[in-house]
Design a protein with these regions (language model features):
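Active-site bordering "gate/hinge" segments
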Residues: 1-264, 395, 401-403, 411-413
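A short secondary-structure junction signal
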Residues: 112-115, 155-160, 236-237, 278-281, ...
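Extended hydrophobic packing segments that form well-structured cores
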Residues: 368-413
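Dual-mode signal for accessory low-complexity, basic/Gly-rich regions
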Residues: 294-363
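Long, well-ordered mid-to-C-terminal structural blocks that present hydrophobic/aromatic surfaces
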Residues: 256-310
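Short linear motifs in exposed loops
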Residues: 225, 295-296, 406
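Active-site lining segments that contact anionic ligands and/or coordinate catalytic metals
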Residues: 262-264, 280-282, 289-292, 315-319, ...
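Short solvent-exposed loop/turn micro-motifs enriched in small/polar/acidic residues
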Residues: 15, 206-208, 276-279, 313, ...
Length: 413
C-alpha cells in the first residue's frame, strides 16, 4: 500500500499545524518538538513557519532509542536532576513568549522493562524544573499545539496485522489525515465548522453551571463536584496576546476542571494508557473527598502507583472531558495507544494539574488563588479514558435536580 498524494497531504498537514494549530504570526518564536524519524515533516513545518513571518524556529529533536539507552544505563543521580542547559532553554523560550508545537510519534512501549524508579524520579525532576513552562502553557500565556505523526514502531502497535511496515505507517498516516480533516476540500473551514459545534456544547454547559457531574457505567459510579464559575472549553483557545490557537489536533472534547476537593466513588478505564513509555491497562481508581484512596492496574500497576503517590497533587483530578462515543475516532474502532487520539474517542479524566483557564479569571490568578478556587495544582497532568457506549452522565444543579447530559455514551440532547 502506498498512500495516494502523500507528499501533497503532508504539506497540507504542515500548513494546518502552523497556520491554524499554532497560528504563527510575524515576529513569533516557535519551539518544535519532534522525533528524528519525522525529518520530512519537520522541514515542512519550519519552512511554513518562516514563510508566515516567524523570527526563529527552534527544533527540539527526540529519539526513542537514545532515550531508552539513557534510562537503561544512566545512574540515578543523573536522572533525578535536570541539566542547567535545559532550564536555560526553557527560560529563553519563556522570555521570548515562544509558541510550542509538539508532534508526537513515539513507540508507546519504548520504555517497557525500564526500572520504574528511574522513570518516576526523572518525571518528577522534569516536572519540578519545568514548572514555569507548565504554568505558562496551562494558563494559555503562550500558544501551544499537540499533534501527531506516524512513527514506525507506533504504527506497528496500532496495526499489528498490516502486511508490511510501510503499510502500517500508511494506515496510521491515513487516520491522522482523516481525523485532522486534511482530506477535506477546505480543511480550514472544516475546522471552523467543527469548532463551532463543540463551542455550542461548551456554551450550554457554561450557561448551566452545574454543581456536579454523576458518571455511571459498568465499573464506574463517580460524582465529581465542579468549582463555582467554572469554564467549559472546546477546540479553540486564546493566548495572552489575544491570538487564537488549537491546543489539540485532532480534538473532539469539551472540558473543564473538577473541584479537586469533591470527588467520591470509583471509576474504571476503558482504553489503554501510554504513559512514560509504558502501556497501562485496566486502571481502577477509588476516590473519597477528592483524593485517590486506591488505584490499581491490570498492567503497569507500579507505574500508576508511582505516578499518583510520588508526585505532589497527583492524588486528585485536574480535568474532566466529555467526548461522545460516536466521535469519528471512536467509531474507527482503533485503539491508538496515544492519549491525543484515545482521549478524543472517549470521556476522560486527568490526574494532576488543572488548566488555569478552567475558572473565570483563572489565567490571572496566582497558584494559591487557583487552589482556593478548587483547581488542583500539580507537576503532572495525565489523562486516562473512561468512556464507552454504556456510560450515562447527569449534570446536578445546586438544588439537586438532575439533567441528563449523556445517555449510552452520547449527548442526551
Amino acid at each position: 500500500m502506498v498512500l495516494p498524494n502523500f507528499k501533497e497531504n503532508l504539506e497540507k498537514y504542515a500548513k494546518l499545524l502552523v497556520a491554524n494549530g499554532i497560528n504563527v504570526q510575524p515576529g513569533h518564536t516557535l519551539a518544535l518538538s519532534i522525533d528524528v524519524e519525522q525529518r520530512e515533516l519537520a522541514h515542512l513545518i519550519v519552512k511554513e513557519a518562516y514563510a508566515l513571518g516567524a523570527h526563529e524556529v527552534i527544533v527540539q529533536w527526540t529519539d526513542d532509542v537514545i532515550n531508552r539507552e539513557k534510562f537503561l544505563h544512566a545512574p540515578m543521580e543523573r536522572l533525578d536532576n535536570v541539566p542547567e542547559y535545559k532550564i536555560a532553554e526553557m527560560n529563553y523560550l519563556l522570555e521570548n513568549k515562544a509558541s510550542r508545537l509538539g508532534v508526537r510519534s513515539s513507540d508507546p512501549g519504548a520504555l517497557n522493562g525500564v526500572d520504574a524508579d528511574k522513570l518516576s524520579a526523572s518525571a518528577k525532576a522534569m516536572g519540578l524544573s519545568m514548572k514555569p513552562m507548565r504554568i505558562a502553557t496551562q494558563s494559555n500565556k503562550v500558544s501551544w499545539t499537540v499533534a501527531a505523526a506516524a512513527g514506525l514502531e507506533w504504527a506497528k502497535k496500532v496495526f499489528p496485522n498490516a502486511a508490511s511496515d510501510e503499510e502500517a505507517v500508511d494506515l496510521l498516516w491515513d487516520q491522522i489525515f482523516k481525523t485532522c480533516r486534511v482530506y477535506e476540500e477546505d480543511p480550514v473551514k472544516a475546522w471552523e465548522d467543527h469548532a463551532a459545534i463543540l463551542k455550542s456544547k461548551a456554551d450550554m454547559l457554561n450557561k448551566e453551571q452545574f454543581s456536579a457531574l454523576h458518571y455511571t457505567a459498568p465499573g464506574t459510579d463517580l460524582t465529581l463536584g465542579l468549582p463555582k464559575n467554572h469554564v467549559w472549553e472546546s477546540a479553540g483557545a486564546i493566548n495572552a496576546q489575544g491570538e487564537g490557537f488549537l491546543p489539540n489536533m485532532p480534538t473532539e472534547e469539551v472540558f473543564t476542571a473538577p473541584d479537586f476537593r469533591r470527588a467520591d466513588g470509583y471509576v474504571t478505564s476503558t482504553k489503554p494508557l501510554s504513559y512514560n513509555g509504558n502501556i497501562i491497562e485496566g486502571i481502577k481508581v477509588t476516590f473519597k473527598d477528592g483524593q485517590i484512596v486506591d488505584i490499581t492496574a491490570e498492567k503497569g500497576d507500579q507505574v500508576m502507583k508511582d505516578l499518583v503517590f510520588e508526585n505532589a497533587g497527583a492524588r486528585a483530578l485536574g480535568e474532566c472531558a466529555l467526548v461522545p462515543d460516536p466521535s469519528p475516532i471512536s467509531q474507527s474502532g482503533i485503539t491508538f495507544f496515544n492519549t491525543l487520539f484515545d482521549e478524543n474517542a472517549s470521556n476522560h479524566l486527568a490526574i494532576g494539574a488543572a488548566y488555569a483557564t478552567s475558572v473565570v479569571g483563572g489565567a490571572e490568578m496566582s497558584e494559591e488563588e487557583l487552589e482556593v478556587a478548587g483547581l488542583n495544582r500539580s507537576d503532572v497532568h495525565v489523562d486516562f479514558m473512561i468512556g464507552s457506549n454504556q456510560m450515562d452522565i447527569d449534570g446536578i444543579r445546586e438544588d439537586g435536580t438532575r439533567v441528563p447530559l449523556f445517555r449510552n455514551g452520547d449527548w442526551a440532547h
